[in-house]
Amino acid sequence: ADDLTTLRNGTLDRGITPDCTFNEKDIELHVYSRDKRNGIILKKEILKNYDLFQKSQISHQIAILIHGFLSTGNNENFDAMAKALIEIDNFLVISVDWKKGACNAFASTNDVLGYSQAVGNTRHVGKYVADFTKLLVEQYKVPMSNIRLIGHSLGAHTSGFAGKEVQRLKLGKYKEIIGLDPAGPSFLTSKCPDRLCETDAEYVQAIHTSAILGVYYNVGSVDFYVNYGKSQPGCSEPSCSHTKAVKYLTECIKRECCLIGTPWKSYFSTPKPISQCKRDTCVCVGLNAQSYPAKGSFYVPVDKDAPYCHNEGIKL
């Protein structure tokens, strides 16, 4: 789970602050492909001549997944997303496991004292991802236009830091960053240099699902406010709503339905009815969002159960 709930409730355990010190050597990469469906774990030092990154394999679209606070690179929701990406679109999926820096060892105690440490670690992990991207581009000749980052919670901001760093390294921009309910605590007043921002990739898509644990302002080219972005159907805990962003995207990848975003100017305005949606005004959440011309804020109605469709049969 990626659970910041007690941080907001102020019920901090005043025990010993956990040690979530970042060390690049602790990072593992879980790599999934059609012939490695259950994933294999790699360390950075063997990446330079790893046969999985042959030309045939590396020519595919690549998705780099980045988890959040208290989580791991092979958490069940990311595992389901990785499998959907390889099954449906034959992606090469690389999930960045920075669990020590994300305080996963303390997840069972729901200890949030390490949160500020984890926040600080996001920049280091972002740099790691950018350096790994440099290897893909320079050694394996992967075009930047083939690489997208998908980050949940703190992982969304980490993706933003990676996006800034690859530009600093003169590699260009990632094709896309998808921020899944980007973390709110410690980022509530942050400006672009210190969080995920629409300039961090060619296209930045944000899916907002919890106003308590996520940011409640626009960060992307498109910002989807699912069920108004406050909380999600069927969820009583903020952590459930926070995690729903991952599940929604996985269903969108499976293409069983289009979660339609309809223009929504501000919290005090009424969104345009889905029935009035056209391809040039509304946007489908997911990997093809970039193919729609509209930008800005969108309200997304959803059902309680997967595949969460609530689009009145409208086809965009």
Curated annotation (Swiss-Prot):
It is found in: Secreted. InterPro entries: AB_hydrolase_fold (IPR029058), Allerg_PlipaseA1 (IPR002334), Lipase (IPR013818), Lipase_N (IPR033906), TAG_lipase (IPR000734). SUPFAM superfamilies: alpha/beta-Hydrolases. Disulfide bonds join C20-C103, C192-C197, C235-C240, C257-C284, C258-C309, C277-C282. It catalyses: a 1,2-diacyl-sn-glycero-3-phosphocholine + H2O = a 2-acyl-sn-glycero-3-phosphocholine + a fatty acid + H(+). The active site is at S153 (nucleophile), D181 (charge relay system), H242 (charge relay system). The keyword Signal applies. Residues 1-4 form the signal peptide. Catalyzes the hydrolysis of phosphatidylcholine with phospholipase A1 activity. May act as an allergen and induce hemolytic activity. Belongs to the AB hydrolase superfamily. Lipase family. This is Phospholipase A1 3. It comes from Polistes dominula.
